[in-house]
């Protein structure tokens, strides 16, 4: 007899969703911790958001500025996952983010992303 498996993140559903950011928002835990590091928010002082509402506000702000986001690659295994997210600005600039995720019951409880921006 095998032990029941815990739900994991459905990366393929995120990757193929017409609006990846909406699909991603649906799998954020209420107590999610979202950490991003890039050239402006360097490792000693990363950008940190606490809670689902704070992350949703950040996503809404990006969308209000015409930024589109797509999950372009990733995998999940048990309570861990990794995603590649590509964001595009209306003017053609792009941001690439690779993130490691901690999961609980298939929802994201911790996001640690490293971003690279077009100059």
Regions found by a protein language model. Name each.
Residues 1-7, 40-46, 99:
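Charged, low-complexity, helix/coiled-coil-prone segments
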Residues 4-5, 35, 39, 80-81:
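General secondary-structure edge motif
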Residues 13, 47-50, 89:
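Residues that cap or flank secondary-structure elements
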Residues 22, 27-72:
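A solvent-exposed, acidic/Ser-Thr-rich amphipathic alpha-helical stretch
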Residues 2-33:
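Short acidic-aromatic low-complexity motifs
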Residues 2-3, 57-119:
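A beta-strand edge to alpha-helix "cap/lid" segment located at domain peripheries
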């Amino acid at each position: 007899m095998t032990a029941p498996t815990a739900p994991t993140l459905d990366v393929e559903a995120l990757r193929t969703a017409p609006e990846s950011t909406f699909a991603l928002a649906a799998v954020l835990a209420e107590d999610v911790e979202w950490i991003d590091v890039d050239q402006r928010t360097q490792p000693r002082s990363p950008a940190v958001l606490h809670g689902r509402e704070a992350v949703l506000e950040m996503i809404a702000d990006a969308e209000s500025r015409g930024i589109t986001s797509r999950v372009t690659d990733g995998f999940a295994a048990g309570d861990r996952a990794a995603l590649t997210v590509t964001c595009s600005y209306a003017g053609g600039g792009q941001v690439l983010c690779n993130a490691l995720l901690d999961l609980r019951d298939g929802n994201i409880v911790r996001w640690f992303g490293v971003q690279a921006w077009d100059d």
